[in-house]
């Protein structure tokens, strides 16, 4: 009887050691988290900020005020926005204070809230080459939204195209100068 238990125990231990427990992040996982926290960490280093958890927490809240789109959603998930439901911001500030790589921090955040690593950046439209007339109104609205602009009074697709062409030199000067159809 003991021999059977020992054999079964050994089999279970072997199976657990072979099965992947906490997998490391695969390429492309936590794209927004790694990119955003990486920029945040670099910003702190560039400004010679004191690396204490309290300071980092305050700086992250300030940094998140400027965040838009998916990055704002990340800030919401970690509790760095005013309207956040949960506060796991200390899961970022404490490890960052000890200079733990952002990949490891995001991996730990993934275990707390899997939504954090499901965030992906939207595919960017190359404004220098795209034919705006072939885009859908939804995509045209998205371009304006990414710039923080709206098109009041726009009813037709041509209205959105006109507004984008009007604002392109301000928000995408390289694309505006590369375009020949303006």
Curated annotation (Swiss-Prot):
Domain of life assignment: Eukaryota
UniProt-listed SUPFAM superfamilies: SAP domain (SSF68906)
Post-translational modification: May contain sialic acid residues.
Annotated function: Selectively promotes the survival of dopaminergic neurons of the ventral mid-brain. Modulates GABAergic transmission to the dopaminergic neurons of the substantia nigra. Enhances spontaneous, as well as evoked, GABAergic inhibitory postsynaptic currents in dopaminergic neurons. Inhibits cell proliferation and endoplasmic reticulum (ER) stress-induced cell death. Retained in the ER/sarcoplasmic reticulum (SR) through association with the endoplasmic reticulum chaperone protein HSPA5 under normal conditions.
Stored InterPro entries: ARMET-like, ARMET_C, ARMET_N, SAP_dom_sf
Modified residues (Phosphotyrosine): 76
Residues making up the signal peptide according to the UniProt record: 1-24
Main localization category: secreted
Similarity section: Belongs to the ARMET family.
Gene giving rise to this polypeptide: MANF
Induction behaviour: By endoplasmic reticulum stress. By hypoxia. Induced by the ER stressor tunicamycin.
One GO term describing the cellular component: endoplasmic reticulum lumen
Any one of the GO BP annotations: regulation of response to endoplasmic reticulum stress
Localization (cell): Secreted; Endoplasmic reticulum lumen; Sarcoplasmic reticulum lumen
Disulphide-bonded residues: 30-117, 33-106, 64-75, 151-154
Record's subunit section: Interacts directly (via SAP domain) with HSPA5/BiP; the interaction inhibits ATP binding to HSPA5/BiP and subsequent nucleotide exchange. Component of a complex containing at least CRELD2, MANF, MATN3 and PDIA4. Interacts (via C-terminus) with ERN1 (via luminal domain); the interaction is decreased in the presence of increasing concentrations of Ca(2+).
Entry note about domains: The N-terminal region may be responsible for neurotrophic activity while the C-terminal region may play a role in the ER stress response. The N-terminal region may be required for lipid sulfatide binding.
Molecular function terms from GO: growth factor activity; RNA binding; sulfatide binding
Official protein name in the record: Mesencephalic astrocyte-derived neurotrophic factor
Keyword DNA-binding: no
Medical condition linked: Diabetes, deafness, developmental delay, and short stature syndrome: An autosomal recessive, multisystem disorder characterized by childhood-onset non-autoimmune diabetes mellitus, short stature, bilateral sensorineural deafness, developmental delay, mildly impaired intellectual development, and microcephaly.
Keyword set includes Nucleotide-binding: no
Span list, region Interacts with ERN1, EIF2AK3 and ATF6: 96-158
Keywords in alphabetical order: Deafness, Diabetes mellitus, Disulfide bond, Dwarfism, Endoplasmic reticulum, Glycoprotein, Growth factor, Lipid-binding, Phosphoprotein, Sarcoplasmic reticulum, Secreted, Sialic acid, Signal, Stress response, Unfolded protein response
Ranges for region Interacts with HSPA5: 129-172
